[in-house]
């Protein structure tokens, strides 16, 4: 092989390796930032396709805050509450200031890490906008696997916290 061909081959290989490394790093970064959405029932029982999150996995979970389940630590901003759809309850632990629209009986979406089978340590809690709004992920998941929730007048008005 003459020197000119060797040089071209080296350049082509370097470009190929560079592009491959870039694509690999992009896919790795995308996979690390992907948070799958679950309802409390799907978190406990698994999704219909059999997937179930592992302890330590980042995820998003959406559902309704159970009435009377909000527990606040008087010495810190730590709050824990139960979340449900129409099945099992999941405990959410959050340290920070909750959104103004957060209240018992309202829908929320929490983003966090699964600590054990029924506990999520959230680093972000989002409250729904009004009593008629339901996040698209929750509405779609509930249409597929659950009966729609019927709100009482008390739930629609809020708990008055």
Swiss-Prot record:
The keyword Nucleus does not apply. It comes from the Bacteria. One of its GO terms (biological process) is cytochrome complex assembly. One of its GO terms (molecular function) is metal ion binding. One of its GO terms (cellular component) is plasma membrane. It is found in: Cell inner membrane. Residues 1-8 are cytoplasmic. Disulfide bonds: none annotated. Residues 30-161 are periplasmic. Keywords: Cell inner membrane, Cell membrane, Cytochrome c-type biogenesis, Heme, Iron, Membrane, Metal-binding, Signal-anchor, Transmembrane, Transmembrane helix. The keyword Cell membrane applies. The chain crosses the membrane at residues 9-29. It is a single-pass type II membrane protein. Heme binds at residues 129, 133. HAMAP family: CcmE. Heme chaperone required for the biogenesis of c-type cytochromes. Transiently binds heme delivered by CcmC and transfers the heme to apo-cytochromes in a process facilitated by CcmF and CcmH. Belongs to the CcmE/CycJ family. This is Cytochrome c-type biogenesis protein CcmE. It comes from Vibrio campbellii (strain ATCC BAA-1116). The lineage of its organism: Bacteria, Pseudomonadati, Pseudomonadota, Gammaproteobacteria, Vibrionales. The gene is ccmE.
